[in-house]
Amino acid sequence: MNQAALARLIALLMPVGLLGGALGSQYLGGLHPCEMCYWQRWPHAAAILLAGAAFHLPGRARLLTALAALAIAVSGAIGVFHAGVELGWWEGLTRCTAGGALSLDELMNVPLVRCDQVQWSWLGISMAGWNAILSLGSAAVITGLLARDRA
């Protein structure tokens, strides 16, 4: 496997794993995401689509893989921002609120999750922190592999 193919594979598998972990923690683990958690998911979804397309469009594979790496890095940057909010380094851009429910009964049953509250951590690092580390690290690896393959 050449380095561009490895980069493409990482660009697909890393966001699949991270987004899968987020969805699994929500639907299987009972952790309710805050607004910034959702913000981090969208770039991963875009990266999955871009990297998946790279497997089917070989003439555009390098560009699509690079764009997937950029999307992964964007999720990582949002993760850095979110982790900083959780640690009290800075304030978030918005107040995390529950979604707009149609009735009072629905509103009372929607979990309110604050963006500055850590719901889960491992080794003292929150999910947002792990997303930042893994996303930025994998984006750097993908970019490095693409650069070395070109050289």
Each language-model region and where it sits:
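Membrane-interface loop-to-helix entry segments
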Residues: M36-A46, V118-G137
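C-terminal TM-helix exit segments that contain a strictly Trp-centered aromatic cap at the helix terminus
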Residues: G20-Q26, V74-W89
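Transmembrane alpha-helical insertion/packing segments
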Residues: M1-P43
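Alpha-helical transmembrane segments and their immediate interhelical/interface regions
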Residues: Y27-L67
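Interfacial segments of alpha-helical transmembrane regions
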Residues: N2-L13, H56-G76, A139-L146
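Hydrophobic alpha-helical segments of small multi-pass membrane proteins
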Residues: R41, A51, T65-G79, R95-S103, ...
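Extracytosolic (periplasmic/ER-lumenal) interhelical loops and adjacent juxtamembrane/interface segments
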Residues: L87-A128
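Alpha-helical transmembrane segments of multipass membrane proteins
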Residues: G20-G24, G52, V118, T143
